[in-house]
Amino acid sequence: MLEVDCPALTPAEVLKTSGHVDKFADWMCKDPKNGDIIRADHFVEEILESRLKGDKEARGVKVEEKEEDPKKKKKKVKATEAVKLDDAVVKEYEEILAKIDNYNGEELGQLIKKYEMKNPATGVEPSPPVAFNLMFQTAIGPSSNMPGYLRPETAQGQFLNFAKLLDFNQQQMPFASASIGKAYRNEISPRSGLLRVREFLMAEIEHYVDPRGGKKHHRFEEVKDVELVLLNRHTQLAGQTHVQKVPIWKAVADGTVDNETLGYFLARIHLFLEKIGIDQSKIRFRQHMANEMAHYAADCWDAELQTSYGWIECVGCADRSAYDLTVHAKKTGAPLMVRERLVEPITIEEWQIDLDKKKFGPHFKKDGKTVEAAVEALPQEKREALAHYLKLDGKITIDVEGVGNGKVEISKDLIVIERRKRVENTREFTPNVIEPSFGIGRILYCLMEHTYWTRGSDGGDEARGVSFMRTP
């Protein structure tokens, strides 16, 4: 594992390529009366939880109250009303809360309308949710011509240095890079002390793995019997929150966890949290649902710890597949790939294209490179069909975006398409990435809450703080 330290200031082009500029956003509402900005999913969650609490009070069920600091200033809000709800409504609310992270902006707006949710501080319904990008934007340099952002994660710096990291590792796979540093997110509603802040410390590992062979991990046997408490996406989509405690080998075998490498890191995360003193009865691994999945993730699990604020996401473990390396390679032209020497050469039969460069350039003039790139990008099945039409008609037509009407005709004197054999001594592939991401502040907060308590002194008048925090 290679440690890297990357800059916090990131050019906008990097984050545009990675998808963060367009997709790294939360849904927010605005109170038209006092101008308060509200995060939409938190608003829906708080309103429904308040109504369920009022229902329990109306039914005579004891509700545990979280102790509040009397010195802390709080916004004036209406007290919870003890109103008994119909059993069907209670079930609806519970199902919504179970999959609250899966709703998009339009669906959150529909929930607010349907259940007549109003801001408790003003009694007014907030505006429809709109997307709000969570990155802090700035300008780089005195001319301010280069836009940039404070990094929302440390991962992009690691991906940009992939080629150097691979060289440092003597071109050997698999390997990993790691980075510890500050990340910055312009949270809509920071709250709960260290749990939701705009500047925080995180530690991320990017483990690069060969996708061929099902993403096996050579040390999976060491952790296969570690039992994890899992809340999968199917359970959440059914509006339920019951969990299953299963050994990680079984979760991988039945497809709940996608592959061995992802399973290996989930088990290692569990063992780490156990070692530092996290209460094992207050930990679960929750799988992301489709709508809450990050734009770069193929699968993702969160290690959530239970606190007085509820279940808090403290560690994320995502299968980023080959997304990041692929998009950065496409944008920059840099080959972010691994070349592996084959033990035995292999013979490949394929359709190959030859262009007459002396005629091709003058014929297409300024569009020559664009057309050539489109031709080279043609898949094998398309090449086979075009070879047939070229032989039959003496010309072919291909789609080329940005040239004329999007259709380009190429005659047989400019192009040859033939089926040939070639021998390969090396294999090229883009590695997949498994990423464990640790929120240091959240882990420390949960650790203190899990290990710190007070007990009465001999006199009975004073309380003494006791901590069972471990030092690994």
For the regions a language model picked out, list residue spans one by one.
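TRNA-recognition modules of translation machinery and tRNA-sensing kinases, especially anticodon-binding
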Residues: 1-472
